[in-house]
Amino acid sequence: MPRSGPILSGRYNTMEVIYRYDGSFEGFLCCVFDSYVNKEIPWEFQDESHLAQSLFPVRWIGTDLRHAQRILVSLEKIDPWAKELVVKGFLTCAANKELLLYRFIRALYRVGKPLLRQLSDDALLPLLKAVRHLDGEVHLLKGFVRFSEFEGMLAGEIRPKNRVLPLLRHHFCSRMYNETFLLYDRTHHEALLHEPGKWAILPLEEFKMAAPSAAEAQYRRLWKRFYDTIEIKERHNPKLRRTHMPQRYWDTMTEFQDESYFLAGTEALPDNPLPLEQAHTPSPLPPSSPAVSG
């Protein structure tokens, strides 16, 4: 016997109507809830930042946390993995991710738990691919994030395709629980802020790293020199390196920056700078070093 969703299902018609919501995960779940209440399948979902004109009427769906919770509870009852797929799916960079999620949820309510074993199903496969891409990017960034120290605070930047900060939060907050740090997502203009005992992910339109201190610039040079030194020159393989360390991450990684990145704020770049491996060895390290560098 087919399952029904959180609202008793009846006949549904695909409507030429667009659901617009506030862009939050809870707001999207309220769109799902309202589609069952109204017994209609929306043509498209748009967040409130969408300004393009449409030929179809637009219906604003307000966010009601009680409605969102009912959807989440219904997914959890079917299978915890179903809930995880929906939560992660909303963080992906998949085109029309709301439609992917909506089709999956409707199919899940209709078929039930057996859908989760049908990995090639049209309602499940696109979502699985998107979530795998998200998980892969999270895994890579756990090793590719580079922090710098600024007056006792650590700061780093990333440029991911997916919204990864909610999934990176536990990794960095648990390993750096005594540190105050900021990790900025350039793509989605949000930042993970942490200080001992508390954290938050907040919108941040712009963020620019300050010029490094002399000590921080020195640590950057040392990290770059370490990276260059450990390579076995006879086994140099640029193609393999790009496979394991995709080039789109390089612009936020210390070891791939140009010469100006390794100068303190009071230093000037010479007209003909020497490569780092030929540069003068930096002065001895200060007695206290930052917990995370590079």
Stretches with model-predicted labels:
Residues 10-66:
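N-terminal ordered "arm"
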Residues 1-13, 293:
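N-terminal amphipathic/basic-hydrophobic helices that include classical n-h-c signal peptides
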Residues 85-89, 186-187, 235-242:
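Short coil/turn segments at secondary-structure boundaries
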Residues 46-140:
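Charged, alpha-helical interface segments at or near domain boundaries
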Residues 180, 191-192, 211-291:
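Long, compositionally biased intrinsically disordered terminal regions
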Residues 114-204:
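Internal, well-folded beta-alpha domain core
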Residues 62-67, 198-211:
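Acidic, Ser/Thr-rich peripheral helices and adjacent loops at domain boundaries
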Residues 27-38, 102-110, 170-174, 221-228:
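Short, hydrophobic/amphipathic alpha-helical patches that form generic packing surfaces
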